[in-house]
């Protein structure tokens, strides 16, 4: 851990020293000073302002975060692997074996040739990417790794131990190498930040199985133990997969937010998603956010009854008036009860719509009853009995005239009845006189 802190501070100082001419106007002529000595490099921005954009069209891929397997430091460690006798155990590898192991671990397509060059090469130092302020940390990391390897090599020469002990010490030294390399790899740029989409279409990583990988079991065991014991290493055990960008905390948070999408159709609260297992890493609990599930309204289907006003009314029904009124009242009450069965939080607009709908139903019932009354009145008038298209005004006039005529006939019949009663009384009195005279 102290090595990592000192490396970070030293890296920041180195980057500040490399980009210090950027912040002073009087030193603008010294921009890309080493590039002016080479004819192959583009000119400084002071000569032509548009020449400073002549970088690579696409930035190179950042070093992989999988314990620094693709970085040049891993190649240096592989070349500096402790060697012993041929019968000394699993730590004795020849140069051909080491190259074969690197080829099997990384694969021919995954090895970037720009990262396997010598860090001390002159072309590597004069590279514009190394001198750029954004990519200068890579050269600093490589230089730091080379210095550490030189110090470890000097310490290895000073130590004198027998071959079995030397083999065990070689494993521990390689574990220290991998620990420092994993710490340096953690300072690299995450490829998922630069490239948000994976480089290949494989959704799940597949382990690279090779029959010759079992020959290097001791070194792989030491690699796993050193990776698990290192605090800067990833919490998962080191496995060889295809080159896919690792899942960071931001990606996990985005996946969790995608799982918490709200269903706007249902009124029930969405159950919080299952908590992720805490066995992955102890820092995973710090990134987890409490799921929020707001209450949403449920869609309510309001049934509306459509009536065909153009259809002619059925006037020749044999139903009595009382029975028809009872059926219509029952139908209206059923419609009102169905309209009130809307199971949703009622607002002022909903209540107003219900009142308007109820008023329309009652008004329609009143008009139908009035129309049936006119039809019944038309049937009672002798002149309009067979006229189904008689207007209401004619029905009212004919009904009034018919009522007046009926009333006049009634008065005539009442007066005639009175005359007949008087005649009856006279006849009864005359009959009594005749009986008395005969007696």
Swiss-Prot record:
Q: From start to end residue, where is composition biased (Polar residues)?
A: 335-347
Glycosylation-annotated residues:
58
Q: How is it modified after translation?
A: Phosphorylated by PRKDC. Phosphorylation at Ser-329 by PIM2 leads to the stabilization of MYC. Phosphorylation at Ser-62 by CDK2 prevents Ras-induced senescence. Phosphorylated at Ser-62 by DYRK2; this primes the protein for subsequent phosphorylation by GSK3B at Thr-58. Phosphorylation at Thr-58 and Ser-62 by GSK3 is required for ubiquitination and degradation by the proteasome. Dephosphorylation at multiple sites by the PNUTS-PP1 complex promotes MYC stability by preventing ubiquitination by the SCF(FBXW7) complex. Ubiquitinated by the SCF(FBXW7) complex when phosphorylated at Thr-58 and Ser-62, leading to its degradation by the proteasome. Ubiquitination is counteracted by USP28 in the nucleoplasm and USP36 in the nucleolus, both interacting with of FBXW7, leading to its deubiquitination and preventing degradation. Also polyubiquitinated by the DCX(TRPC4AP) complex. Ubiquitinated by UBR5 when not forming a heterodimer with another bHLH protein, leading to its degradation: UBR5 recognizes and binds a degron that is only available upon heterodimer dissociation.
Q: Which GO terms describe its biological process?
A: chromatin remodeling; chromosome organization; DNA damage response; G1/S transition of mitotic cell cycle; intracellular iron ion homeostasis; MAPK cascade; negative regulation of apoptotic process; negative regulation of cell division
- Top-rank taxon of the source lineage equals Eukaryota
Motif 9aaTAD at which residues? 100-108
Where is this protein chiefly located?
nucleus
UniProt lists compositionally biased (Basic and acidic residues) regions at 266-278, 315-331
UBR5-degron, short sequence motif: residues: 355-364
Q: Which residues carry this modification: Phosphothreonine?
A: 8, 58, 315
Instruction: Tell me which residues bear Phosphoserine.
Output: 6, 62, 71, 81, 151, 159, 161, 293, 314, 329, 344, 347-348
Annotated SMART domains: HLH (SM00353)
Any one Gene Ontology MF annotation carried by this entry is: protein dimerization activity
Annotated crosslink Glycyl lysine isopeptide (Lys-Gly) (interchain with G-Cter in SUMO2) location:
52, 143, 148, 298
> According to the UniProt entry, which residue ranges have a biased composition of type Acidic residues?
251-263
Pfam families on file: HLH (PF00010), Myc-LZ (PF02344), Myc_N (PF01056)
Q: Which residues carry this modification: N6-acetyllysine?
A: 143, 148, 157, 275, 317, 323, 371
- Report the Gene3D superfamilies cross-referenced here: Helix-loop-helix DNA-binding domain
UniProt domain comment:
The 9aaTAD motif is a transactivation domain present in a large number of yeast and animal transcription factors.
Q: How does it assemble?
A: Efficient DNA binding requires dimerization with another bHLH protein. Binds DNA as a heterodimer with MAX. Interacts with TAF1C and SPAG9. Interacts with PARP10. Interacts with KDM5A and KDM5B. Interacts (when phosphorylated at Thr-58 and Ser-62) with FBXW7. Interacts with PIM2. Interacts with RIOX1. The heterodimer MYC:MAX interacts with ABI1; the interaction may enhance MYC:MAX transcriptional activity. Interacts with TRIM6. Interacts with NPM1; the binary complex is recruited to the promoter of MYC target genes and enhances their transcription. Interacts with NUP205.
UniProt xrefs under PANTHER family:
MYC PROTO-ONCOGENE (PTHR45851)
Query: What's this protein's function?
Result: Transcription factor that binds DNA in a non-specific manner, yet also specifically recognizes the core sequence 5'-CAC[GA]TG-3'. Activates the transcription of growth-related genes. Binds to the VEGFA promoter, promoting VEGFA production and subsequent sprouting angiogenesis. Regulator of somatic reprogramming, controls self-renewal of embryonic stem cells. Functions with TAF6L to activate target gene expression through RNA polymerase II pause release.
Question: Could you identify this protein by its name?
Answer: Myc proto-oncogene protein
UniProt source species:
Galeopterus variegatus (Malayan flying lemur)
By which gene is this protein encoded? Answer: MYC
């Amino acid at each position: 851990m102290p090595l990592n802190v000192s490396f970070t501070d030293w890296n920041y100082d180195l980057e500040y020293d490399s980009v210090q001419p950027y912040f002073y106007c009087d030193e603008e002529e010294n921009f890309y000073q080493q590039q002016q000595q080479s004819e192959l490099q583009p000119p400084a921005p002071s000569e032509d302002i548009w020449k400073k954009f002549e970088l690579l069209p696409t930035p190179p891929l950042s070093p992989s975060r999988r314990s620094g397997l693709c970085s040049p430091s891993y190649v240096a460690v592989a070349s500096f692997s402790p060697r012993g006798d041929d019968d000394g155990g699993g730590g004795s590898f020849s140069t051909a074996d080491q190259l074969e192991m690197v080829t099997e671990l990384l694969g021919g397509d995954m090895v970037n040739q720009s990262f396997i060059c010598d860090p001390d090469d002159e072309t590597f130092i004069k590279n514009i990417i190394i001198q750029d302020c954004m990519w200068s940390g890579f050269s600093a990391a490589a230089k730091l790794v080379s210095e550490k390897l030189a110090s470890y090599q000097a310490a290895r020469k000073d130590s004198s131990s027998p071959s079995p002990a030397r083999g065990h010490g070689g494993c521990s030294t390689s574990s220290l190498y991998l620990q420092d390399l994993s710490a340096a790899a953690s300072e690299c740029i995450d490829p998922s930040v630069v490239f948000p989409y994976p480089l290949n279409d494989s959704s799940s990583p597949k382990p690279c199985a090779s029959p010759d990988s079992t020959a290097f079991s001791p070194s792989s065991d030491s690699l796993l133990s050193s990776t698990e014991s290192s605090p800067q290493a990833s919490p998962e055990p080191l496995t060889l997969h295809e080159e896919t960008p690792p899942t960071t905390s931001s990606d996990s948070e985005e996946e969790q937010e995608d799982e918490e999408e709200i269903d706007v159709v249902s009124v029930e609260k969405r159950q919080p998603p299952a908590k992720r297992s805490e066995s992955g890493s102890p820092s995973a609990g710090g990134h987890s956010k409490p799921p929020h599930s707001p209450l949403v309204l449920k869609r309510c289907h309001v049934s509306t009854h459509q009536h065909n006003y153009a259809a002619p009314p059925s006037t020749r029904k044999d139903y009595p008036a009382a029975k028809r009124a009872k059926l219509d009242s029952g139908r209206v009450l059923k419609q009102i009860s169905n309209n009130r069965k809307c199971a949703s939080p009622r607002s002022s607009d909903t209540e107003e719509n219900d009142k308007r709908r109820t008023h329309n139903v009652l008004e329609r019932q009143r008009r139908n009853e009035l129309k049936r009354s006119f039809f019944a009145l038309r049937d009672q008038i002798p002149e309009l009995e067979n006229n189904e298209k008689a207007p209401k005004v004619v029905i009212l006039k004919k009904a009034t005239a018919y009522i007046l005529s009926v009333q006049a006939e009634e008065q005539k019949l009442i007066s005639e009845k009175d005359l007949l009663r008087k005649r009856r009384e006279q006849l009864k009195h005359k009959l009594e006189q005749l009986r008395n005279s005969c007696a």
